[in-house]
Amino acid sequence: MIADNILDRNFQADRPNQKWLADFTYVWTAEGWLYVAVVLDLFSRRAVGWSMKAERDASLVMDALMMAVWRRGKADALLHHSDQGSQYTSEQFQRLLADNGITCSMSRAGNVWDNSAMESFFSSLKTERTARKVYRTRDAARADVFDYVERFYNPQRRHSKLGYLSPVAFEARAMQT
């Protein structure tokens, strides 16, 4: 099922778990491609869910979404925005969204600007970590991507849109006010 573009390039969120962006990218290894799916909370730009596999089927993006739901819990009025890839339009993925009360939004066909904040995350991942590396195995790439997301990007990487705070620090500050 292809959903309407409800997000409509409104990349602002007033609270955590209001708008999640999702997409996946590829990392080359000597064993072949490693596919990396990520769910990003638009409020803080925090990677709240991710999955890495040798295949790019619906389970790749479903696992990333399930991690996000497990970490953040079910939220009221949550919007999930992705592209129109077959993984996101699959019956299994759409059922998972519905079962968790999540509204589906999708970019217009072939329009990367409709999910530009997600594209920016992957640009950072590749520029800052994976582009200059040669991974011998998928496991080596998995370990490095995990390190980037969980030990650097979420807790340390500063964002101009967040007042030069990291996603974790931005959320912590927001919880205090």
Protein language model regions, located:
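Charged DNA-binding/catalytic regions of mobile-element recombinases
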Residues: 1-177
